[in-house]
Amino acid sequence: MRWISRPGWPGHLLALAAGALTPLALAPFDYWPLAILSIALLYLGLRGLPGKSALWRGWWYGFGAFGAGTSWIYVSIHDYGAASVPLASLLMLGFTAGVAFFFALPAWLWARCLRRDNAPLGDALAFAALWLALELFRSWFLTGFPWLYAGYSQLQGPLAGLVPVGGVWLSSFVIALSAALLVNLPRLFPHGASLLLGLVLLLGPWAAGLYLKGHAWTHSAGEPLRVVAIQGNIAQELKWDPNQVRAQLDLYRDLSLPQQDVDLIVWPETAVPILQDMASGYLGAMGQVADEKNAALITGVPVRERLTDGKSRYFNGITVVGEGAGTYLKQKLVPFGEYVPLQDLLRGLIAFFDLPMSDFARGPADQPLLKAKGYEIAPYICYEVVYPEFAAALAAQSQVLLTVSNDTWFGTSIGPLQHLQMAQMRALESGRWMIRATNNGVTGLIDPYGRIVRQIPQFQQGILRGEVIPMQGLTPYLQYRVWPLAGLAGVLLLWALLGRQLRPQERRLFG
């Protein structure tokens, strides 16, 4: 098995296969032990490699992970971006090759500066710290791409109890640490004290996760809210067709009018497919309907801001009418879907760079939350719910979470189910109920433990009825966010860096 840790194609191909295991640990497959196996194979494959070989080993791992785990991007480019099969394949390969460097560069850094082959415990801790740093970096760099985090595999796994303590980040850290420790255990057997400490580090977090699973970190802030969520199941090719606007508005109105004994009526992202000011009469009428029901209606709608120079800016928004108030403008935009980077160069080249409603501006930071039925509601539009720190900042001010989305862009791929899993993790991290309304699925209600308690199947028109309980109190993660864990990771990485620079006789302090 030494070939695994040697330069060359056999090890690279194994890294490719190991990376491709990543999505199998996540929704919709949920074979969570594969997350540990995948990372363990990468860790083993990097052992002893020089920097350049480690860089390519990490790149092949990343290519496998993103190639398999974000294959739904091809659906968006080909099916809805009108790109030919060769062009869509080329763009998908280019994207995958680029994001694979998220793993390549840390692998190079690991080999050149941090790896300590003669200190199995310290090496495992430093590797887990580097893995956490990688996931944090991915959530920030170039607006972020926080997809395929290892920690999502533990949504309902043994580590779920740790998620309210340290978020998905803590789950990822423990998985990476466990993977490295399992690889290094045989090297610890001759050393009793080190073996004992290694077993504590390996088993302790899993035992703590099981012990805390189901612990109630938050409590009720009032009576349950009766919720109706509408899933319109509008085909994407009809979504922005001007001839279909009236039919869509009528559909959501007609599905909502009969609803009685309701507090919140929720429509999906851009359920109103025209600008808010153009739909003012319609929204005003629906607000009156909501008032008559003693309810609030919350819907996605694009928003126009007229500027003093005669130009306008456009936002992806959510607004409340009836017994509530507020309009929220989306802050985390999807590249190419909601805005086009370098648009002066790319606009007009292919249809994918000219999708409908792909010229949104970013909403301002520090917007007030939505208000409905006397409660503060944290809003997330589509992609925003996948950012743990961003979501936590809003959740800490709220009693209920709300996310609206249109995952029609991803067809029947695994993308919408991965997206749903990340939304569930936000509910678990915050200890709050979440309402999720989507155009074609999955619309559902999620409890504070990340469990779906009501849902409408994908690709069906439907009406979901249920209750959510406003919650108060802060989980440890909402209180302290990722900072304690990031600080620990920083100390571990500095420890590894210093330990590597010392002479052999001085390394015992850092071993």
Curated annotation (Swiss-Prot):
Pathway field: Protein modification; lipoprotein biosynthesis (N-acyl transfer)
Documented EC number(s): 2.3.1.269
Top-level taxon of origin: Bacteria
Keyword Amino-acid biosynthesis: no
Protein location: Cell inner membrane
Every CN hydrolase domain range: 230-470
GO biological process: lipoprotein biosynthetic process
Any one Gene Ontology cellular component term annotated for this protein: plasma membrane
Residue positions of the active site: E269, K330, C382
Keyword Membrane: yes
Gene Ontology molecular functions: N-acyltransferase activity
Alphabetical list of InterPro entries matching this protein: Apolipo_AcylTrfase, C-N_Hydrolase, C-N_Hydrolase_sf, LNT_N
Mode of membrane association: Multi-pass membrane protein
PROSITE patterns linked to this entry: CN_HYDROLASE (PS50263)
UniProt keywords, alphabetically: Acyltransferase, Cell inner membrane, Cell membrane, Membrane, Transferase, Transmembrane, Transmembrane helix
Pfam families: CN_hydrolase, LNT_N
Regions crossing the membrane: 7-29, 58-78, 90-110, 125-145, 163-183, 192-212, 482-502
Role, per record: Catalyzes the phospholipid dependent N-acylation of the N-terminal cysteine of apolipoprotein, the last step in lipoprotein maturation.
Protein family according to the UniProt entry: Belongs to the CN hydrolase family. Apolipoprotein N-acyltransferase subfamily.
Annotated protein name in UniProt: Apolipoprotein N-acyltransferase
Source organism: Pseudomonas aeruginosa (strain LESB58)
Lineage, highest ranks first: Bacteria, Pseudomonadati, Pseudomonadota, Gammaproteobacteria, Pseudomonadales
Gene this protein is translated from: lnt
